[in-house]
């Protein structure tokens, strides 16, 4: 009886080890499909003013360039769906007929109607951005060229504007909103991707031009963004 008991115990032990090995194998096998798409990115966009401002004209090229890094957090076993959070830098500039002027340490804004002057009035500013996004891609562990759709929002810390007016010296504008947000959609194949972004806040703090029209400067951005592993 003792021998039979030992044989039975050994069988149970072998069976337990067998099933344990199957579980461990399946876990290792599932882990083999798990990967991250941590990426550096670089992009450039063209600005289109979204708010209607009387007599406002956008002249020349207005846009930005951006660069940064996205940390990938897969949310399914095949890693085709993920969340992303990143850190980036943006340099923005736009040319228009908005003319800031300084008098007694106060800044005033007006619309310049002269065709000659308006094309020379460039305003620029920089931002630190925190993109948070949902990421879908048609990729595998060994496939590096695939379709992707990344959509989310950005929180931006903005730094003072600088204006190169049509006449006079450069002006430092402190009226910029310190924090703004935007929503975006990036989609494409492999390295090349279309980038769409829409500002949810105006850039300037509750400013008006000389005729008391609200100076709500916000943009729709259309451009390209490139991802690198």
What are these regions (language model features)?
Residues 1-34, 224, 228-229:
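Bacterial Sec-dependent N-terminal signal peptides
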Residues 26-72, 225-229:
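Short glycine/proline- and aromatic-enriched beta-strand/turn motifs that initiate or cap beta-hairpins
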Residues 28-38, 74-81, 139-147:
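Short loop/turn motifs that connect adjacent beta-strands in outer-membrane beta-barrel proteins
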Residues 31, 35, 49, 174-229:
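Predominantly the C-terminal beta-signal and adjacent terminal strand-loop region
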Residues 48, 57-115:
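Glycine- and aromatic-enriched membrane insertion/assembly motifs of diderm outer-membrane
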Residues 53-57, 95-102, 161-168, 205-211:
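Outer-membrane beta-barrel translocator domains and adjoining extracellular loop/strand segments
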Residues 73-75, 119-205:
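Outer-membrane beta-barrel transmembrane domain signature
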């Amino acid at each position: 009886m003792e021998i039979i008991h030992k044989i039975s115990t050994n069988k149970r032990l072998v069976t337990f080890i067998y099933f344990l090995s199957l579980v461990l194998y399946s876990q290792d096998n599932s882990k083999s499909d798990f990967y991250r798409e941590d990426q550096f990115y670089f992009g450039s966009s063209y600005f289109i003013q979204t708010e209607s401002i009387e007599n406002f004209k956008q002249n020349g090229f207005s846009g930005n360039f951006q660069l940064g890094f996205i940390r990938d957090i897969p949310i399914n076993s095949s890693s085709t769906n993920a969340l992303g959070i990143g850190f980036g830098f943006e340099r923005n500039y736009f040319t228009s007929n908005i003319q800031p002027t300084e008098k007694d340490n106060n800044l005033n804004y007006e619309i310049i109607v002269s065709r000659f002057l308006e094309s020379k009035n460039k305003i620029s500013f920089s931002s630190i951005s925190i993109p948070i996004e949902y990421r879908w891609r048609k990729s595998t562990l060994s496939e590096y060229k695939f379709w992707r759709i990344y959509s989310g929002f950005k929180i931006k810390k903005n730094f003072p504007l600088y204006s190169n007016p049509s006449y006079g010296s450069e002006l430092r504008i402190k009226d910029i909103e310190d924090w703004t947000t935007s929503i975006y959609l990036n989609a494409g194949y492999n390295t090349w991707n279309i980038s769409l972004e829409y500002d949810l806040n105006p850039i300037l703090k509750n400013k008006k031009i000389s005729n008391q029209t609200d100076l709500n400067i916000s943009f729709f951005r259309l451009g390209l963004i490139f991802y690198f592993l």
